[in-house]
């Protein structure tokens, strides 16, 4: 499913040999899968992704492209993003799978907020519609996975209270919502608090 990736990728190393946060990432992925906030559509196209910052570095681990529907991830399903260039629309990574198509968007959050340690990108049409333009929202003219989205994300940190609310609605990517926090626990909790505001499906 690499056709959904809109940036150029440079693989700089083979398989990831270790990722201490994999068990926790899988635990929160299972919760999101159970809630159908990530997964795969009827045609098998995956949606949703998670990432975790690599300690105090700028690098981050992210679920690989087209892995949304996989129940349990291994190291072969994750990539480690080690460099990016918004202007050149380029990502450098380690791993045996290409990083998620939203890697530049995740990178923009980590670059803009030094306290961010994890990012969740999910899909929920009802929540998306409920908080569109009420929560920090990207322009509906900006497509997902593009340098424009990365720049838009960085701008949200200067013109909105996104650093406090830690949630973003992607207006040009129907259903797309991002939350972030110091870790996956916080990013997931923020999403759940917002979800509780809408009536049960």
Give residue spans per PLM region.
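Glycine-rich flexible loops
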Residues: 1-201
């Amino acid at each position: 499913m690499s056709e959904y990736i809109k940036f150029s990728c440079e693989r700089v190393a083979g398989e990831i040999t270790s990722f201490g946060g994999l068990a926790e990432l899988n635990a929160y992925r299972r919760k999101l899968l159970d809630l159908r906030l990530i997964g795969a559509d009827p045609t098998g196209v995956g949606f949703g992704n998670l990432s975790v910052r690599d300690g105090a570095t700028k690098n981050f681990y992210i679920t690989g492209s087209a892995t949304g529907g996989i129940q349990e991830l291994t190291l072969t399903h994750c990539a480690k993003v080690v460099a990016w260039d918004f202007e050149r629309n380029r990502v450098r990574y380690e791993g045996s799978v290409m990083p998620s198509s939203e890697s530049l968007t995740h990178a923009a959050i980590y670059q803009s907020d030094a306290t961010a340690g994890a990012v969740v990108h999910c899909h929920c049409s009802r929540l998306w519609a409920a908080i569109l333009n009420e929560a920090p929202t990207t322009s509906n003219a900006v497509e997902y996975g593009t340098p424009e989205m990365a720049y838009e994300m960085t701008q949200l940190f200067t013109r909105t209270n996104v650093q406090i609310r830690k949630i973003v609605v992607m207006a040009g990517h129907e259903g797309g919502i991002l939350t972030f926090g110091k870790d996956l626990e916080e990013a997931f909790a923020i999403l759940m608090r917002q979800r509780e505001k809408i009536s049960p499906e």
